[in-house]
């Protein structure tokens, strides 16, 4: 049972100096750069992009409500 390299095993949060543990916009314990595609476009033709400040992949703000 090996500990996750990004995770402080005592506090269960990113180690000091690291940004994140996992997520579509997290790689090697760091947030991916803003503008990195985290979800490729489907029928709507709009990709979703990382923000550079979160490990989540936010929905493209230009997608309409019907694109859910």
From Swiss-Prot:
Subcellular location: Secreted
Domain Disintegrin stretches: 1-65
Keywords tagged on the record: Cell adhesion impairing toxin, Disulfide bond, Hemostasis impairing toxin, Platelet aggregation inhibiting toxin, Secreted, Toxin
GO cellular component: extracellular region
Major localization class: secreted
Pfam families: Disintegrin
InterPro entries: Disintegrin_CS, Disintegrin_dom, Disintegrin_dom_sf
Disulfide bonds: 6-29, 20-26, 25-50, 38-57
Oligomeric and partner information: Heterodimer; disulfide-linked.
Function: Poor inhibitor of platelet aggregation. The disintegrin inhibits the adhesion of both the alpha-4/beta-1 (ITGA4/ITGB1) and the alpha-5/beta-1 (ITGA5/ITGB1) integrins to VCAM-1 and fibronectin respectively with almost the same degree of specificity. Inhibition on alpha-IIb/beta-3 (ITGA2B/ITGB3) is low.
Name of this protein: Disintegrin EMS11A
Native source organism of the sequence: Echis multisquamatus (Central Asian sand viper)
Lineage per the UniProt record: Eukaryota, Metazoa, Chordata, Craniata, Vertebrata
